[in-house]
Amino acid sequence: MQIFVKTLTGKTITLEVEPSDTIENVKAKIQDKEGIPPDQQRLIFAGKQLEDGRTLSDYNIQKESTLHLVLRLRGGAKKRKKKSYTTPKKNKHKRKKVKLAVLKYYKVDENGKISRLRRECPSDECGAGVFMGSHFDRHYCGKCCLTYCFNKPEDK
C-alpha cells in the first residue's frame, strides 16, 4: 500500500509499505529517500507520536494516509551557574535596647523631686512625650521641626 509523509518544508514523500511494517522500517525508508537519521525523526499521525516498536496497523494507518515528519530536538535550556557574590552581605541594623532608658530624661534631687532634663515639644502635632533635642544654641523638635533659639549660648 502507499502512504504519504509530509516534511516540515511542505514536501510530500510517497512510500510503499505494508500494514505489518513497523515504524522503525518506515523511518528507515524515509532515511533512504531524505537522508535524515531515524533517531532524529518523529512521525505523527492523527495528533499522536508513533512509537518505534509498533506497526502501522496498530495505529490504524490505511492506504493513502498522511504522516507528518518532525525533527527531534535534543536537550533543553543551558544550565545556569549559581551567582557568587564577591562582597559579603550587609547585616541589617539592629536597634540597641537599653534598659531604663527613660531615666536619662529626668533627674531626681535629694528631696525626691523629679525634674525634666529635656524640654517637651509644645506643638499639638507632636503630643505628650516628644522631647526636643538640646543643642548648644537651640532646642529642636525632630518630629515637627519646631526650633527655639537662645540669645546667648550661656542661657541654656
Swiss-Prot record:
Q: Which Gene3D superfamilies match?
A: 6.20.50.150, Phosphatidylinositol 3-kinase Catalytic Subunit, Chain A, domain 1 (3.10.20.90)
Ubiquitin-like domain residues are: 1-76
List residues of cross-link (Glycyl lysine isopeptide (Lys-Gly) (interchain with G-Cter in ubiquitin)): K6, K11, K27, K29, K33, K48, K63, K107, K113
Q: Name one GO molecular function term.
A: zinc ion binding
Write down which residues bear the modification named Phosphoserine. Answer: S65
Q: Which residue spans match zinc fingers labelled C4-type?
A: 121-144
CDD domains per the UniProt record, alphabetical: Ubl_ubiquitin
Which residues form the Glycyl lysine isopeptide (Gly-Lys) (interchain with K-? in acceptor proteins) crosslink? G76
As stated in the Swiss-Prot or TrEMBL entry, residues carrying the post-translational modification N6-acetyllysine are: K104, K113, K152
GO BP, one annotated term:
ribosomal small subunit biogenesis
Site label Interacts with activating enzyme, positions: R54, R72
Where is the PTM ADP-ribosylglycine found along the chain? Answer: G76
This protein's record includes keyword Flavoprotein? no
**Residues flagged as site, Essential for function:** H68
InterPro entries from the xrefs?
Answer: Ribosomal_eS31, Ribosomal_eS31_euk-type_sf, Ribosomal_zn-bd, Ubiquitin-like_dom, Ubiquitin-like_domsf, Ubiquitin_CS, Ubiquitin_dom, Ubiquitin_ubiquitin-like
* Keyword terms of this UniProt record: Acetylation, ADP-ribosylation, Cytoplasm, Isopeptide bond, Metal-binding, Nucleus, Phosphoprotein, Ribonucleoprotein, Ribosomal protein, Ubl conjugation, Zinc, Zinc-finger
Q: Name one GO cellular component term.
A: cytosolic small ribosomal subunit
Q: What does the record's miscellaneous section state?
A: Ubiquitin is encoded by 4 different genes. Uba52 and Rps27a genes code for a single copy of ubiquitin fused to the ribosomal proteins eL40 and eS31, respectively. UBB and UBC genes code for a polyubiquitin precursor with exact head to tail repeats, the number of repeats differ between species and strains.
The similarity annotation says:
In the N-terminal section; belongs to the ubiquitin family.
This chain belongs to the protein called Ubiquitin-ribosomal protein eS31 fusion protein
* Species assigned in the record: Mus musculus (Mouse)
Q: What is the lineage of its organism?
A: Eukaryota, Metazoa, Chordata, Craniata, Vertebrata
